[in-house]
Amino acid sequence: MTKVVEILQYRLQAGSGERFHHIMQHDSVPLHQAAGITVLEYGVSLHDPDAYYLLRRFDGMVEMEQVLQAFYRSQAWLEGPRTEIVTLIDESHRVVLPYQS
């Protein structure tokens, strides 16, 4: 089984980078970790305060899809930071690559 890394890149609403990072740091990333998702890195881009990234690692493509489906359907996510996070994102891009540890 080939491990994979998922890179998410977000274009945030103007001026919301600091707020978004606070939500990620205190709400979203802890939820990811509680769900068994390995978060490798996350934060505000060095070149733009309203650009954000999230890197997550999974044991394979099938595991990634199963884990993410369960996570995004969970009450903890739906009743937690979901609405505020989604509201702050103007655009998102996703890339999945093989992970060499």
Residue ranges of predicted features:
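Short, structured motif recognition centered on aromatic/hydrophobic residues
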Residues: 4-9, 20, 32, 51-56
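Short beta-strand micro-motifs enriched in acidic
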Residues: 44-47
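An amphipathic, aromatic/His-enriched active-site/gating alpha helix that lines ligand/cofactor pockets
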Residues: 22-40, 57-94
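Non-catalytic surface loops within mature trypsin-like serine protease
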Residues: 12-14, 60, 98-99
